[in-house]
Amino acid sequence: MARYIGPKCKLSRREGTDLFLKSGVRALESKCNIEAAPGIHGQRRGRQSDYGTQLREKQKVRRIYGVLERQFSGYYKQAASQKGATGENLLQLLECRLDNVVYRMGFGATRAESRQLVSHKAISVNGQTVNVPSYQVKAGDVVAVREKSKNQLRIAQALELCAQRGRVEWVEVDAEKKSGVFKNVPARGDLSADINESLIVELYSK
């Protein structure tokens, strides 16, 4: 499945919530009516079946983190094989992706931009260049912008945006040095309450 490159507002309207796919403190323009489905006339949503609700939740989380279908399925299998709650394990695996950590630290304005920074070899982990967005960051790892990329305007702008919206507690960042530490894997209570991972578990359990 190819990666979606169309309008970001359309995806948020499809899921009925702001997925924060666009840069800025408020990701969507006021004209983007997330209460209505995509399309010129934006039909109101009818009642969904249990399966439809579960599928929409999976698609929402997949789109938030910018993960393709096959990758997401792989993460679920890995989460199910680990000890603990499968849903929480799944969210933690997604949070530990390098592109997501780069976004959480504020080096990229969006996860898509952060993924591009990683792919273009602008990011290092513990002093070593890593260009794999799905690389799993571990507690204590130092994630930094490489010297050759530190003067990029978009990184400075992303750090400003992050300062406005607030940084998560499980990363510690030196904005001047453009370097940060992934202090710990976030607990479920630290993550968005707008995600109902139990619906995803129900979907894959069928």
UniProtKB/Swiss-Prot annotation:
Annotated Gene Ontology cellular component terms: small ribosomal subunit
Tagged with keyword Ribosomal protein: yes
Keywords for this protein: Ribonucleoprotein, Ribosomal protein, RNA-binding, rRNA-binding
Biological process terms in GO annotation: ribosomal small subunit biogenesis; translation
SUPFAM superfamilies: Alpha-L RNA-binding motif (SSF55174)
GO molecular function, one term: structural constituent of ribosome
SMART domains documented for this protein: Ribosomal_S4 (SM01390), S4 (SM00363)
Organism superkingdom: Bacteria
Domain S4 RNA-binding: 96-156
Keyword Transferase recorded: no
Pfam families, sorted: Ribosomal_S4, S4
InterPro entries documented for this protein: Ribosomal_uS4, Ribosomal_uS4_bac-type, Ribosomal_uS4_CS, Ribosomal_uS4_N, S4_RNA-bd, S4_RNA-bd_sf
PROSITE patterns per UniProt: RIBOSOMAL_S4 (PS00632), S4 (PS50889)
PANTHER family: 30S 40S RIBOSOMAL PROTEIN (PTHR11831), SMALL RIBOSOMAL SUBUNIT PROTEIN US4M (PTHR11831:SF4)
Main function: One of the primary rRNA binding proteins, it binds directly to 16S rRNA where it nucleates assembly of the body of the 30S subunit. With S5 and S12 plays an important role in translational accuracy.
The family this protein is said to belong to: Belongs to the universal ribosomal protein uS4 family.
Assembly with partners or alone: Part of the 30S ribosomal subunit. Contacts protein S5. The interaction surface between S4 and S5 is involved in control of translational fidelity.
Name of this protein: Small ribosomal subunit protein uS4
Organism: Ectopseudomonas mendocina (strain ymp) (Pseudomonas mendocina)
Upper classification of the organism: Bacteria, Pseudomonadati, Pseudomonadota, Gammaproteobacteria, Pseudomonadales
